[in-house]
């Protein structure tokens, strides 16, 4: 199997080491569409990350959870990242998965453009994704298609924009702390 290349970034070379090769090989057997679904595979700082095309996320998630040889039955966390310089792939969502059965840990990473920030929801695959998808929507603006109640969870319902994005204005709201006022970040002293 040839490893796909994305924007000049090749996959990490095989062998990956540890159980990573076994997971990658088992996944390739369990999911025949893997070469189409995976953009690249990275091993960095002791973490195995599969970069998944968003249209294959749900299928791959079901295989990772349900295949007896893999059994990634727990979604530990789901988080968003905004890379404004990664044109056409500005929004990333990272899924941390654990196999309690085999004591293994992997990550999935899915990217979407600002112009079309839709990624399939995995709430019905891993219920722990529920509030985490809502938080990622609230903070980054990623729309999780199929989520049963994609509403704001941290910010007020009428809050404009998504405050964790790097293009979000730093304005701020003046805060009073023990009688002293803290100005918004835009009005604070600049340090060179």
Curated annotation (Swiss-Prot):
Disulfide connectivity for this sequence is none
The keyword Cell membrane appears for this protein: yes
Its topology with respect to the membrane? Peripheral membrane protein
Question: Which Gene Ontology terms of cellular component type are present?
Answer: plasma membrane
Can the keyword Hydrolase be found in this entry's annotation? no
Q: Which UniProt keywords apply?
A: Cell membrane, Membrane, NAD, Quinone, Translocase, Transport
| Pfam families in UniProt | Complex1_30kDa
Q: How does it assemble?
A: NDH-1 is composed of 14 different subunits. Subunits NuoB, C, D, E, F, and G constitute the peripheral sector of the complex.
Query: What role does this protein play?
Result: NDH-1 shuttles electrons from NADH, via FMN and iron-sulfur (Fe-S) centers, to quinones in the respiratory chain. The immediate electron acceptor for the enzyme in this species is believed to be a menaquinone. Couples the redox reaction to proton translocation (for every two electrons transferred, four hydrogen ions are translocated across the cytoplasmic membrane), and thus conserves the redox energy in a proton gradient.
What is the protein name for this chain?
Answer: NADH-quinone oxidoreductase subunit C
